[in-house]
């Protein structure tokens, strides 16, 4: 991990200093709010807003869950201050669909992106609207619609990287840092998709992208958390190392991209496939003029787009995969979660051809449930989908509350994901939580559960990938990668935890993965083969509840479910 404790302490000191000097002055610039929206976390004390905002540095979960319990569970909105002293109103579950259906002319994420994501202060180079347009187009045109073409190279890279990180010794457990190892699996795999061979295996290329993504991620959290008046001042300092990593990455990518676009490998179908993503980028640049950019193929522009896409895609996938492996490693051994995932992988991935077919992974109901549950249990943002009120006349929430222009409105994601009304025993990670619904949906085609319960499909109570038309456009690609990583691991390794599962760590809205946590994998003596007596399906057994599986950490291995012939 390239982030030292000293750097982290400096970040916290800078935030505290920024609050002490600027918060009170920023309050008069905030949009007005009606008193009809209750504010949670605001106490009757000196510098109340400043102190309420500072408490969100590490206490955001407490404030959000307090407001959720008092108001959201009674279908009422509430407001809370964020780390930058902005007030945000959070709507109840019944209003999530209404919220997502509002046009950008009413509720827009542009202003939030500029401030909370610090785009206005950190962005360098290519135009932001052009970049966002590119990400949406390339994700739909090249990733989501071509998963069948991407599956084989993705698997090759995942297989190679996992063997490098986990080793192949069947006699000794190897302790690994989960976050670092996942990073060294995800980054080369995404580079394989974006850049192809041999660039994805060029350590100079991958390390440059990795450093840039890390620097941009830290800068986004830091600058995005500051009051507006000090953002631009400190952003100038933060942009110095960020600009350095950006120049380094561009210096590596631009000549390589130019060479591949100008001199494609003729007559080599594999090479053509490997450079297909770059050619799709060029096609979008040629045919779509956005923000003054377009109708021209510029390697510099394509390189910057790929850097932003790598940041958007890899950051979230690394966090999700890290949490997933830690969740599974900490399940009680008598649940036999890894064994059941292994049996499922063997039955659905019987040949090399199956690995090339994304439909093979759609059959993995246990894997899908484990991933979905991890995203429920560890949302990347504890509150999200935040948008800004656009009309000068404001907007009216479904309960009649009037929100003025410039107000921020969002959704209490963590509160919804921990609501007992939707998820029994919500404080526990249960990898089998969604298995019964998924099977029921498949047996009764056309039911609501059958169409909704997929790790890549958001609902109003499952917001791991956002919701509505602005949900993560790369969620099917990310889910396929997570399933591939999981299948490759369970087919070739046993894994065990080295310590109890760490608590969720939140800074502001961002739920960070436990970057120092470790697990121990050990290679299986040989590739697992499904025995003739192995389970064929999962069926409901109401007569034999598996009470021994109840656990505070990972309960109910399939409670009221068992494996049958």
UniProtKB/Swiss-Prot annotation:
Keyword Manganese set for record: no
Main subcellular localisation: membrane
Lineage start: Eukaryota, Fungi, Dikarya, Ascomycota, Pezizomycotina
Annotated gene: efuH
Recorded family membership: Belongs to the cytochrome P450 family.
Top-tier EC class: oxidoreductase
GO CC list: membrane
EC number: 1.-.-.-
Membrane topology: Single-pass membrane protein
Transmembrane segments: 3-23
Protein's organism: Hormonema carpetanum
Entry function: Cytochrome P450 monooxygenase; part of the gene cluster that mediates the biosynthesis of enfumafungin, a glycosylated fernene-type triterpenoid with potent antifungal activity, mediated by its interaction with beta-1,3-glucan synthase and the fungal cell wall. The pathway begins with the terpene cyclase-glycosyl transferase fusion protein that most likely uses 2,3-oxidosqualene as substrate and catalyzes glycosylation immediately after cyclization.
Any single GO BP term: terpenoid biosynthetic process
Disulfide topology: none
Residues binding heme: 472
Pfam families linked: p450 (PF00067)
Protein name (record): Cytochrome P450 monooxygenase efuH
Pathway: Secondary metabolite biosynthesis; terpenoid biosynthesis
């Amino acid at each position: 991990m390239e982030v030292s404790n000293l750097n982290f302490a400096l970040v916290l000191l800078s935030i505290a200093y920024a609050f002490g000097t600027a918060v009170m002055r920023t309050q008069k610039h905030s949009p007005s709010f009606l008193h009809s929206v209750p504010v949670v976390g605001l106490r009757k004390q000196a510098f109340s807003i400043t102190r309420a905002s500072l408490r969100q540095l590490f206490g955001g979960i407490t404030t959000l869950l307090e407001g959720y319990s008092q108001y959201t569970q009674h279908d009422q909105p509430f407001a809370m201050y964020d780390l930058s002293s902005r007030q945000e109103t959070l709507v109840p579950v019944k209003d999530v669909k209404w919220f997502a259906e509002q046009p950008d002319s009413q509720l827009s994420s542009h202003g939030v992106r500029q401030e909370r994501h610090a785009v206005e202060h950190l962005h360098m180079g290519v135009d932001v609207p052009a970049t966002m347009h590119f990400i949406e187009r390339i994700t739909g045109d090249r990733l989501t619609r071509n998963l069948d073409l991407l599956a084989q190279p993705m698997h090759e890279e995942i297989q190679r990287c996992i063997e490098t990180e986990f080793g192949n010794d069947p006699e000794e457990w190897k302790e690994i840092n989960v976050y670092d190892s996942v990073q060294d699996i995800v980054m080369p795999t995404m580079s394989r998709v974006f850049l192809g061979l041999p660039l994805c295996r060029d350590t100079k290329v991958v390390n440059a992208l990795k450093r840039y993504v890390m620097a941009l991620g830290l800068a986004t959290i830091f600058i995005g958390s500051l009051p507006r008046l000090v953002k631009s001042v400190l952003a100038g300092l933060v942009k110095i190392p960020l600009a350095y990593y950006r120049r380094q990455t561009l210096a590596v990518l631009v000549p390589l991209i130019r060479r591949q676009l100008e001199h494609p490998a003729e007559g080599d179908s594999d090479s053509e496939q490997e450079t297909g993503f770059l050619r799709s980028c060029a096609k979008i640049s040629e045919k779509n003029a956005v923000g003054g950019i377009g109708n021209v193929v510029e390697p510099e522009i394509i390189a910057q787009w790929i850097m932003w896409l790598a940041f958007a895609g890899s950051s979230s996938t690394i966090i999700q995969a890290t949490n997933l492996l830690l969740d599974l490693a900490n399940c009680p051994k008598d649940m036999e979660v890894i064994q059941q995932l292994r049996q499922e992988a063997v039955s659905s991935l019987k040949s090399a051809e199956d690995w090339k077919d994304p439909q093979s992974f759609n059959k993995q109901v246990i894997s899908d449930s484990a991933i979905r549950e991890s995203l429920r249990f560890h949302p990347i943002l504890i509150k999200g989908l935040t948008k800004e009120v656009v009309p000068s006349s404001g907007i009216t929430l479904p309960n009649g509350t009037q929100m003025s222009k410039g107000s921020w409105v969002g959704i209490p994601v963590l509160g919804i994901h921990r609501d007992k009304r939707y998820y029994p025993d919500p404080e526990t990670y249960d990898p089998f939580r969604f298995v019964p619904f998924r099977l029921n949906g498949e047996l009764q085609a056309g039911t609501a559960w059958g169409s909704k319960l997929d790790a890549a499909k958001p609902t109003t109570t499952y917001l791991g990938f956002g919701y509505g038309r602005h949900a993560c456009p790369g969620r099917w690609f990310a889910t396929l990668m997570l399933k591939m990583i999981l299948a490759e691991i369970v087919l070739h390794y046993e894994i065990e935890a080295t310590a109890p599962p760490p608590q969720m760590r939140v800074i502001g809205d961002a739920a960070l993965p436990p970057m120092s946590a470790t697990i121990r994998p050990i290679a299986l003596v040989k590739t697992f083969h499904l025995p003739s007596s192995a389970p064929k399906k999962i069926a409901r057994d109401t007569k034999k509840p598996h009470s021994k599986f109840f656990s505070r950490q990972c309960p109910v291995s399939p409670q009221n479910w068992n494996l049958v012939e």
